Regions:
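Acidic-and-aromatic substrate-binding clefts and catalytic sites of carbohydrate-active enzymes
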Residues: 29-35, 54-65, 129-138, 159-160, ...
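His/Asp/Glu-enriched short active-site or ligand-binding loop at hydrolase and phosphoryl-transfer sites
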Residues: 144-187, 244-248
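Active-site beta-loop-alpha junctions enriched in small/polar residues
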Residues: 30, 56-58, 80-82, 156, ...
């Protein structure tokens, strides 16, 4: 069973190797100001750790432009409407190739326009976060032509650039138990996921250059979720072999 001591021990191994493990934080499903979003932003301010917030453009309220304008906040596009277009036999997806690519391209372009309307030209990072972390290859290939230069899903990336001009940086630690009671997934699941990715990177079994991503969903959190985020940030920021990176640093604009 993985414990907080095990996480510290893994980071100690990074320190012994003279290396530093990079983390990043992505939070999904923002649509408007809520007490949960306020709590997330307050935690960000107190911790000093940057957060990338994935906004659903079709449902986004204009008030988000002001709420998410603070320091240490990057904004990503979370699909278009977070609507499932698969039939009942397949896993949920909005960006699957079982839809006409033209329809997907139109929606994503409309969503991108909505993001510019709310956040301005320089107020967000043109990175795509597919709903349910699912996107098929033909849709991925569309993204650079639509103006996106980043892609973020879940689990260790298979390629730094899944399409020319498109940088992938994924998340690896999902704190919500989606298949159970939809509360906190528990220390065993979350810490094991963190340690597994760190260990795989250190041992050359995963891309060492990919930051280890913490995935949260502020609207779904119970108290245990919030407690984990606080503790995870505390342990990592207090270790010399750990650092946190912003989405803007991880998804550079192509020159």
């Amino acid at each position: 069973m993985s414990t907080w001591k095990d996480l510290t021990a893994e980071l100690d191994l990074w320190a012994e190797a003279g290396d530093v493990a990079t983390f990043w934080w992505r939070d999904d499903d923002a649509v408007g100001p809520t007490p949960a979003l306020d709590r997330l932003l307050d935690l960000r301010r107190k911790s000093g750790v940057p957060v990338a917030i994935a906004v659903i453009p079709a449902n986004a309220q204009p008030a988000l432009g002001d709420v998410l304008s603070g320091d240490g906040i990057d904004i990503l596009q979370h699909g278009y409407a977070h609507r499932n277009h698969r039939d009942g036999t397949g896993k949920k997806a909005e960006l699957g190739d079982d839809r006409a690519l033209w329809d997907i391209a139109r929606e994503l372009a409309d969503g991108r326009g909505r993001m510019f309307d709310i956040f301005g030209e320089d107020g967000w990072t043109e990175t795509m976060v597919p709903p349910w972390n699912r996107i098929d290859e033909p849709v991925t290939a569309l993204l650079p032509g639509l103006g996106f230069h980043g892609l973020s899903t879940f689990r260790a990336r298979e390629a730094v650039q899944p399409a020319p001009g498109l940088t992938a940086v994924n998340t690896h630690i999902d704190i919500v138990d989606w298949d159970g009671d939809r509360g906190y997934a528990g220390d065993q699941a979350t810490l094991s996921a963190a340690i597994a990715h760190l260990s795989a990177k250190r041992g050359g079994l995963a891309d060492r250059g990919e930051a280890t991503g913490l995935l949260t969903h502020h609207l779904a959190h119970d108290d245990a979720c919030w407690a984990f985020i606080d503790a995870f940030i505390d342990v990592t920021t207090g270790h010399p072999a750990a650092q946190w990176a912003s989405a803007r640093a991880l998804f550079p604009v192509p020159r």
